[in-house]
């Protein structure tokens, strides 16, 4: 978890290389432009396959992920060639459907395996298992690009609509309704509000008085309060793992839980915050609360996320928000995450998903002498990928795809079979860690509070590898460990999975020395009106204008629209499209700046 690094190297890696100057900003901007273009590319593939239906067949989720990753790598070849040591995919393209919160990026050879593993299951995860999207699905697209370690990530939620084929121009039959619409609305409004709020760090005098004025700047506590207020207004819960955090060179949150990052600066939503909210509002006097705060083994407290920070100019922030609808939750409960595994035959529980992760992260703190030649060769390829997550298909000589054809697919599947053999020994010796597939779950509080917990926090979930420092216990006040919480999820029929909407943007707070104008500005590397327009939805909920926090949210929205006296917001535009040719599921596309 901790590596010995000299003070001089620490100064270079964490300070000098993260000073926002023109060369650094250009790398961020180029990475953002490629990410924006890739998002537009994959959404156009989905629209062509499922809405306009101009393709000969519908592209499946594994194919969409593979084509998008290939597109990103092809675009990267045009920039900073022989000028930087590292550039590539920061996050393999994931396409999470409905209840899946993150991590769904199956390999191209897993299509039949998913069908076999989930044979006889109900239709809760039918779209994910078959790889074919259905009307009403919430599709969360996540991808990322880095150039020389400067990272731009983006996530966007789009809706698959039923299409009215009786009209000459295919159109959706109507807006999305219900709990899924609530989650989409909450995620979009929260994203736009937080972007405007962070822009106030450049001009503190414009921060609305109802949000604290210029008293202490933009703090982590203020960010949390605003996001929680929006979530409650739309009957949603903030999914654990959501975060608004500062990112730095090679430190974009891609390996949280593997590397204890010094001077961590950001707001992170976990189960413990829901627990604190429950205990602060309870009237019960006989509830035993145990303080487990001193049990953390980490001595470097700066690596533990805390809301006690102030946003400053010259910083880069990742805003990653996930909202889960509580439409079918009849009482108070805990929104948590369940990790999917590939172990079959362990139960016949309804609504269960069996799958194996598609992405891995290299843990450079671990060393081991591998026995298999295949494993050693594979590890050599993995080490060239750097510190970012990767898929086994990225290591194949057939990647990236220029054209999709049967011969290349068969060659790739042959490579994957060999890679899986080597990866088995590598992961068993902890040289690589799987990026988990996680499902949003709801568990009633009364079931948690009534359960016996004789071991307290002594039990430890060894499979929970990607855990932030200081958050090893999901419910520290109640002394409930991760392994106990996992058993509680499976021991009640009241526990249900929740649909999730996700929005993720990367922004830069530019001071006047690097801005395109003489004024400080917020540069939106990813997201915005060109690539992340909200889908057609209708929610029955709305913000309460009598709430002082909501009044501040409305004022931030007004400032964001005021081009003259409001906040100065700029968006990175995707590359312009010259030509697109689609045939037999293969896609060729050329771009220009």
From Swiss-Prot:
Purpose of the protein: Probable metalloprotease involved in proper assembly of pre-ribosomal particles during the biogenesis of the 60S ribosomal subunit. Accompanies the pre-60S particles to the cytoplasm.
Note: Present with 45100 molecules/cell in log phase SD medium.
EC main group: hydrolase
EC number: 3.-.-.-
UniProt entry keywords in alphabetical sequence: Cytoplasm, Hydrolase, Metal-binding, Metalloprotease, Nucleus, Protease
Subunit details: Component of the nucleoplasmic and cytoplasmic pre-60S ribosomal particles. Interacts directly with REI1.
Protein name, per record: Probable metalloprotease ARX1
Single biological process term from Gene Ontology: ribosomal large subunit export from nucleus
Top-level lineage group: Eukaryota
Gene source species: Saccharomyces cerevisiae (strain ATCC 204508 / S288c) (Baker's yeast)
Any single Gene Ontology cellular-component annotation: nucleoplasm
Cellular compartments annotated: Cytoplasm; Nucleus
InterPro entries attached to this UniProt entry: Creatinase/aminopeptidase-like, PA2G4/ARX1, WH-like_DNA-bd_sf
Family label: Belongs to the peptidase M24 family.
GO molecular function: metal ion binding; metallopeptidase activity
């Amino acid at each position: 978890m901790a590596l010995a690094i000299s003070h001089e190297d620490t100064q270079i890696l964490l300070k000098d290389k993260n000073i926002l100057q023109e060369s650094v900003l250009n790398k961020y901007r180029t990475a953002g432009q490629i990410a924006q273009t890739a998002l537009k590319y994959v959404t156009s593939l989905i629209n062509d396959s499922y809405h306009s239906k101009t393709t000969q067949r519908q592209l499946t989720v594994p194919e969409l992920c593979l084509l998008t990753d290939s597109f990103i790598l092809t675009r990267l070849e045009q920039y900073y060639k022989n000028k930087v040591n590292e550039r590539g995919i920061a996050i393999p393209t994931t396409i999470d459907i409905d209840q899946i919160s993150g991590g769904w990026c199956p390999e191209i050879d897993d299509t039949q395996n998913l069908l076999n593993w989930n044979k006889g299951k109900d239709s809760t995860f039918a779209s994910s298992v078959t790889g074919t999207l259905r009307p009403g699905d919430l599709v969360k697209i996540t991808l990322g690009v880095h150039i020389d370690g400067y990272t731009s990530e983006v996530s966007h939620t789009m809706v698959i609509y039923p299409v009215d084929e009786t009209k000459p121009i295919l159109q959706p039959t109507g807006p999305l309704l219900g709990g899924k619409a609530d989650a989409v609305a909450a995620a979009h409004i929260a994203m736009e509000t937080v972007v405007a709020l962070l822009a106030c760090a450049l001009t503190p005098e414009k921060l609305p008085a109802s949000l604290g004025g210029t008293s202490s700047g933009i703090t982590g506590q203020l960010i949390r309060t605003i996001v929680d207020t929006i979530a409650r207004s739309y009957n949603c819960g903030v999914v654990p793992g959501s975060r608004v955090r500062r990112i730095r060179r090679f430190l974009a949150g891609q390996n949280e839980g593997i590397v204890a990052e010094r001077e961590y600066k950001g707001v992170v939503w976990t189960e413990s915050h829901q627990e604190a909210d429950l205990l602060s509002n309870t009237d019960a006097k006989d509830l035993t609360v145990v303080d487990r705060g001193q049990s953390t083994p980490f001595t470097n407290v700066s690596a533990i996320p805390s809301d006690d920070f102030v946003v400053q100019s010259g910083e880069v922030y990742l805003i990653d928000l996930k909202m889960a609808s509580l439409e079918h939750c009849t009482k108070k409960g805990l929104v948590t995450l369940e990790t999917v595994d590939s172990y079959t035959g362990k139960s016949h529980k309804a609504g269960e998903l069996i799958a194996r992760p598609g992405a891995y992260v290299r843990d450079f703190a671990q060393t081991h002498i591998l026995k298999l030649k295949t494993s050693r060769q594979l590890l050599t390829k993995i080490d060239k990928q750097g510190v970012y997550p990767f898929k086994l298909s990225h290591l194949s000589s057939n990647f990236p795809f220029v054209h999709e054809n049967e011969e290349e697919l068969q060659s790739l599947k042959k490579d994957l079979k060999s890679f899986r053999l080597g990866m088995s020994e590598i992961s068993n010796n902890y040289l690589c860690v799987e990026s988990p597939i996680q499902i949003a779950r709801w568990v009633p509080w009364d079931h948690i509070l009534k359960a016996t917990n004789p071991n307290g926090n002594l039990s430890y979930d060894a499979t929970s590898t990607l855990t932030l420092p200081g958050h090893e216990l999901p419910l520290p006040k109640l002394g409930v460990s991760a392994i106990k919480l996992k058993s509680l999820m499976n021991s009640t029929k009241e526990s249900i999975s929740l649909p999730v909407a996700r929005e993720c943007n990367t922004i830069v707070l530019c001071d006047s020395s690097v801005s395109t104008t003489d004024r400080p500005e917020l540069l939106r590397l990813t997201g915005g009106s060109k690539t992340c327009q909200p889908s057609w939805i209708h929610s029955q909920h709305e913000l309460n204008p009598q709430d002082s926090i909501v009044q501040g949210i409305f004022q931030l929205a007004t400032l964001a629209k005021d081009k003259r006296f409001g906040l100065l917001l700029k968006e990175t535009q995707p590359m312009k499209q010259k030509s697109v040719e689609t045939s037999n599921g293969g896609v060729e596309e050329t771009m220009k700046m």
